[in-house]
């Protein structure tokens, strides 16, 4: 049983995972969350007496021996989930690509969608899948990048000895972008494939084929088919089960408790934390909020580009959608490449319209008969919305919402079935969660490979968790970063205790 105390700022998946691991080892953990719910991007909020997901709706890594499933098993957490064999369709200007798990059906889909270059596309994807397998193998070794201490290696040395060809292949492709791999198959100018990859990558790694690092992108482009899961009661259940486990282990979670100040006491070698419901000193701090509390306390303060999101939440009549959704296992997603008929979308946003249909639920999480929930997000630059006057902001927001619904209408009749819709911009995110940026940093070769962001900050005994962990971004990487931070604290505080005795 450790007497060490740790404060976790932010109850996202990364913060909750680190708190659960530390609490299991006997550390006294206190989680401070600004919102009324836990889970962060895997959480939820209430609008018009309906429960909407904050961000993610589909989970990855929950297959048997999957990364997230393994972490949960280590924490003695059972999380029921149902696999989705056809989780998404990507709507391109000249066709559609269905993302399906079955390998034979997927190859058929590639041949049909990219018929003129089907041979090259199939070979490209086979290589991508192999690289993805290699990346997953290294990630399963629990190596934490950048490697600064011996324990950051995890079991990578053993993995390298057992899989020399795999590691050599990763070394060969380490500095590749996705476009570089496309060039090997003379596909860099093949626009239909480029449109598919850009749509998938912007959502997953926050950039396009020209800049996306191949190694993390290979996993992002294959992860839907590796295993997509619907968690019973929604993605918010992941945060709930982690929070419950922390409490069972003696940890404390304080919601609606935003942090006001964070100061390091050099003489005591402790952090003084002041929030609405907590004023105390801690041996270590983990920042999962994405908010800066001073130099070196968050990656938000660095000169690094991040996207914001334009978001539409809606409730639809299920009856009018029954024909289109009757063969779909919900949640079901569409990525829609916008047409030229949507000038406001093209001026203010970037990439595809990402829309997910799910069962509508009330604040208690109970299904609402006759309704379908629709959540929509588009990438947008952070600064443009604050430059508008109040009237311009309102007008452009309404126009982008209108065009977004029209883009979805090309695929499924939402307008005539619309019961309620509400839009938000990065300014809305800032108002409710304290930050405009979402989704992490673009996974360029620099950000992902040559200068990855560590869970250790430049400040003593302060750690940063979130979507920056390799292979990132997303819930899976957030959970991994939480594990890495907990591992670092257990090792570092033990070393600090020995130093204090001398």
Which residues are covered by each model-predicted region?
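N-terminal glycine-rich phosphate/pyrophosphate-binding loop and immediately adjacent elements
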Residues: 3-143
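Active-site/ligand-binding neighborhood in enzyme catalytic cores
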Residues: 129-249, 437-445
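A glycine-rich dinucleotide-binding beta-alpha-beta segment and adjacent secondary-structure elements
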Residues: 192-207, 413-472
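Mid-domain catalytic core of redox enzymes
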Residues: 230, 258-368
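A conserved beta-strand/loop element that lines the FAD pocket in flavoprotein oxidoreductases
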Residues: 246-259
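C-terminal segments that line or cap access tunnels to active or ligand-binding sites in enzymes
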Residues: 319-426
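A conserved FAD-binding loop/helix module that cradles the flavin
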Residues: 467-489
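Active-site-proximal substrate-binding core of FAD-dependent oxidoreductases
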Residues: 491-502
């Amino acid at each position: 049983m450790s007497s060490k105390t740790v404060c976790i700022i932010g109850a996202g998946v990364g913060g909750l995972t680190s708190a659960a691991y530390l609490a299991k080892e006997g550390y006294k953990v206190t989680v401070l969350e600004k919102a009324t719910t836990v889970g962060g991007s895997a959480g939820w909020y209430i609008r018009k007496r309906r429960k909407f997901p904050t961000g993610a709706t589909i989970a990855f890594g929950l297959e048997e021996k999957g990364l997230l499933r393994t972490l949960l098993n280590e924490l003695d957490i059972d999380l029921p989930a149902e696999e989705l064999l056809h989780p998404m369709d990507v709507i391109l200007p000249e066709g559609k690509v269905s993302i399906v798990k079955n390998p034979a059906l997927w190859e058929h889909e590639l041949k049909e969608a990219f018929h003129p270059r089907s041979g090259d596309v199939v070979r490209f994807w086979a290589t991508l899948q192999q690289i993805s397998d290699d990346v997953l193998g290294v990630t399963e070794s629990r190596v934490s990048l950048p490697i600064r201490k011996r324990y950051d290696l995890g079991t990578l040395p053993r993995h390298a000895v057992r899989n020399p060809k795999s590691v050599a292949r990763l070394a060969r492709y380490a500095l590749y972008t996705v476009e570089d791999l496309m060039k090997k198959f003379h596909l860099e100018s093949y626009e239909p494939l480029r449109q598919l990859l850009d749509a998938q990558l912007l959502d997953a790694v926050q950039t396009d084929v020209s800049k996306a690092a191949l190694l993390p992108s290979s996993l992002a482009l294959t992860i839907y088919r590796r295993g997509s899961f619907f968690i019973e009661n929604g993605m918010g259940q992941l945060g709930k089960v982690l929070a419950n486990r922390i409490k069972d282990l003696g940890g404390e979670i304080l919601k609606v408790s935003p942090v006001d100040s964070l100061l390091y006491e050099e003489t005591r070698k402790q952090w003084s934390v002041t929030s609405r419901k907590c004023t105390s000193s801690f041996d270590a701090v983990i920042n999962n909020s994405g908010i800066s509390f001073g130099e070196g306390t968050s990656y938000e303060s660095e000169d690094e580009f991040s996207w914001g999101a334009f978001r539409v939440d809606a409730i639809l009549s299920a009856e009018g959608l029954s024909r289109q959704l009757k063969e779909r296992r919900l949640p079901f997603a569409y990525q829609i490449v916008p047409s030229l008929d949507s000038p406001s979308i093209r001026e203010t946003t970037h990439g595809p319209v990402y829309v997910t249909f799910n069962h509508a639920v009330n604040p208690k999480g109970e299904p609402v008969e006759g309704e379908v929930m629709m959540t929509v997000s588009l990438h947008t630059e952070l600064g443009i919305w604050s430059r508008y006057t109040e009237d311009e902001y309102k007008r452009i927001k309404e126009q982008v919402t209108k065009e977004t619904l029209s883009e979805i209408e090309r695929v499924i009749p939402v307008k005539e079935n619309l019961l309620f819709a509400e839009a938000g911009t990065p300014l809305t995110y800032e108002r409710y969660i304290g930050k405009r940026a979402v989704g992490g940093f673009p996974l360029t070769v620099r950000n992902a490979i040559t200068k990855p962001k560590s869970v250790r900050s430049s400040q003593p005994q302060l750690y940063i968790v979130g979507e920056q962990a390799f292979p990132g971004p997303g819930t899976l990487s957030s959970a991994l970063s939480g594990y890495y931070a907990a591992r670092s604290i257990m090792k570092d505080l033990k070393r600090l205790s020995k130093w204090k005795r001398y």
